[in-house]
Amino acid sequence: MKAYELSIEEAAAKLRAGDISSVELTQSCLQRIGDVEDRVKGFITVDEEGALAQAKAADKALQNGETNPLCGIPMSIKDLLAVKDLPMTCGSKMLEKFIAPYNATIVDKLQGAGAVNLGKVTMDEFAMGSTSETCAFGVPQNPWKEGYVAGGSSGGSAVTVAAQECFFSIGTDTGGSIRQPAALCGVVGMKPTYGRVSRYGLTAFASSLDQAGPLCRTVADTALVMNSICGYDPMDSTSINQEVPDYTASLVEGVKGLRIGIPKEYFAKGLDSEVEKVVRNAIAVLASAGAEIVDVSLPHTEYCVAVYYLIAPAEASTNLSRYDGALYGYRDLESKTLEDMYKDTRSAGFGDEVKKRILIGTYALSSGYYDAYYKKASQVRTLIIEDFKNAYRSCDVLLSPVTPTPAWKLGAKSDDPLAIYLSDIMTVSANLAGIPGMSVPGGFTEDGLPVGIQLQGSHFQEEILLKVAYNLEKLLAIQPGKLDF
C-alpha cells in the first residue's frame, strides 16, 4: 500500500510510531497529484513549497509529543476559504489574482492541529452550481468515470479525496455542495449544523445557508476532522457557542433501538432505480442490525427547490455587489466612466451562471416584488423547518438518497439548468432548516458509479449521524471499485 492510500487513522498511527514522516506523506501526495491531476483536474493551486515547510514543522511537533491525529496529515481546501498568502479565486475570473491577506478560522484551526495544506481546489464559480462546470480554471472530472461530472460546488474537494491526492478536504455546503459531490465521487461528506463551524474567512454565497465541512474517505476520519474544526468563534456572528463533543467517542456503539425515518417524498417519481436499490439495501441492513424503521413525511419538500432558488440568489445578489472593480479583484481598464467600469467589470468578471443568479436575486428583492417572492419564500422556509421538527418527534435520523441519479456526463445538462437545479431537491432542505446532513458511500451502479446515502439529523446531532454512518460503513462492507489510474 502506498502512503497516499492510507486513511487518516492509519497515517496518524504510523506518524506517531515513527514509521513514516509527514514529509514523506506529503511527498507521496504531491507525487500522486503530479501523476493524476491531468485526469481529474482537482486543484487550482498546488503549494508544494508551503506544504513541505508545513510538513517539516509537523514532524518537529510530533517529535515533541504532539498527539493531535491531524498533525502531519495532508489536506486540500476549497478555493473560497482564505489561506494567507495563497490565491483565493472562488473559481471566478473576478478574483483571479486575489491573494488572501489572512486565514479563515477553520484554516487556523487545522493549521493549529498540524494539518498540511497542499493547495486550493476547483469549485463552481462562487459556489453556484451542482457540477463544478462553472469553474473558470478547469472542470474537475469524476475519478470513477472519465468525462462524468464530479458534482458541486465542492467538486474539487470530492475529487482530490476520491483520487487519493490528499487525505481530506474542506468544502462548503449551501444547498448540497458537500454532500452531492461526496455522493457522486464515493467519499464521505459532512455538512454540520449551521453555526457549528466558523464561517469567518469563507467567501459568502448565501449567508444564511453556507456552512463549511469535511470530505474524507472514511467516517472515522470525518469524526477526527470534525473534532478539530467545530467550535465557537467570536469573529463569526452566526457562530453558536455550544459544547463540542468528541465525535469519535460513540462511533462504535450500535444502532439497535435507533429510529431511522424514511421520508416518503424523497422516493418519488424521478428517482433512478439503481440509486433506490442501493438506498433500500442500506435501510434493510440497518433494520437487520436492530434499528427501527419509521415512515415519515416532509410535506413541503416539493417547494424546497423553488424556495432555495429564491432565497440563495437574493442573498448572493447582495453579497456579490461588492465585486465592482473599485477595491480588489478584476477591473476593466478600458472603461471611460465609473459607471462603465462597474458594468464592464461585472460583465466580464462574472460567468453566466453567477450573472443569472444575481439577476434572479435582484429581481426577487426589488420594490414591488419583495413580498411576492422573497418574503413568501422565507415564510415557506419556516414551514420546511417545522416539517423537520415534526419528523424528529418520531425518529432520530432521516435516511434518503442524496441525489436522484448517479453522476452524468459532463455537459449533458448544460442546456437544461432546471434539470441541474432539481438534482438538489433532496439536499437544499437541510440548508434551509440549518440542520446537519451527510453523505456516506452506499454502493455502486452497474456502470461503476458511486451512490451515496444521505443522513440528516436535528440541530447539533452530528454525533448520531456519524454513529449511524459508521455502522452503515461497517455493515455494508462495500468493496470499492478500482480507479483506472
Swiss-Prot record:
The active site is at K78, S153, S177. Allows the formation of correctly charged Gln-tRNA(Gln) through the transamidation of misacylated Glu-tRNA(Gln) in organisms which lack glutaminyl-tRNA synthetase. The reaction takes place in the presence of glutamine and ATP through an activated gamma-phospho-Glu-tRNA(Gln). Signal peptide: none annotated. GO terms for biological process: translation. It is an enzyme of class 6 (ligase). It catalyses: L-glutamyl-tRNA(Gln) + L-glutamine + ATP + H2O = L-glutaminyl-tRNA(Gln) + L-glutamate + ADP + phosphate + H(+). One of its GO terms (molecular function) is ATP binding. This is Glutamyl-tRNA(Gln) amidotransferase subunit A. The gene is gatA. Belongs to the amidase family. GatA subfamily. Its EC number is 6.3.5.7. Heterotrimer of A, B and C subunits. The keyword Cell wall biogenesis/degradation does not apply. InterPro entries: Amidase (IPR000120), Amidase_CS (IPR020556), Amidase_dom (IPR023631), AS_sf (IPR036928), GatA (IPR004412). GO terms for cellular component: glutamyl-tRNA(Gln) amidotransferase complex. It comes from Desulfotalea psychrophila (strain LSv54 / DSM 12343). Keywords: ATP-binding, Ligase, Nucleotide-binding, Protein biosynthesis.
